């Protein structure tokens, strides 16, 4: 088992026991977002030259108001010098929480903004295909796909965009020597 899975499973077990699965998930998302948004904070947190004692104090301050589980988990990562796997642990922990709660997060990329009604229709259709699981839709816009949509969930990618179809057609033509 990888270190990422080991840490994620340990955190999941502790959070489930305390009925704090979603709180810890929100905390970790917030902490990771702060690291991505502040280069200074990221250099401090990931920096190997920073003494463990200072990192622990900083974690205490940065996680004030968060679950003690989150605070302790981050300290353990630092104590074991495994800070670099935090984002991967977050992704694995997210998957575990979503699976446990019967939810699935689906990213939908379209060429134009989706209306609320269209988002709901897509959510319902995906839920039917995935056996009635609760679908959490994350939408984004990429005009370069021209039309259609690209769906990402778990380790899967479903490209039904016009750009994807055109690229597929181009590849098929190249294989047959048409172009």
From Swiss-Prot:
Major site of localization recorded for this protein: membrane
InterPro entries to which the protein is assigned, alphabetical: ATP_synth_OSCP/delta_N_sf, ATPase_OSCP/dsu
UniProt KW Membrane keyword: yes
An example molecular function term from Gene Ontology annotations: proton-transporting ATP synthase activity, rotational mechanism
Keyword Cytoplasm appears in the UniProt entry: no
GO cellular component terms, semicolon-separated: plasma membrane; proton-transporting ATP synthase complex
Self-association state and partner proteins as the record states: F-type ATPases have 2 components, F(1) - the catalytic core - and F(0) - the membrane proton channel. F(1) has five subunits: alpha(3), beta(3), gamma(1), delta(1), epsilon(1). F(0) has three main subunits: a(1), b(2) and c(10-14). The alpha and beta chains form an alternating ring which encloses part of the gamma chain. F(1) is attached to F(0) by a central stalk formed by the gamma and epsilon chains, while a peripheral stalk is formed by the delta and b chains.
Protein name, as recorded: ATP synthase subunit delta
Gene (UniProt): atpH
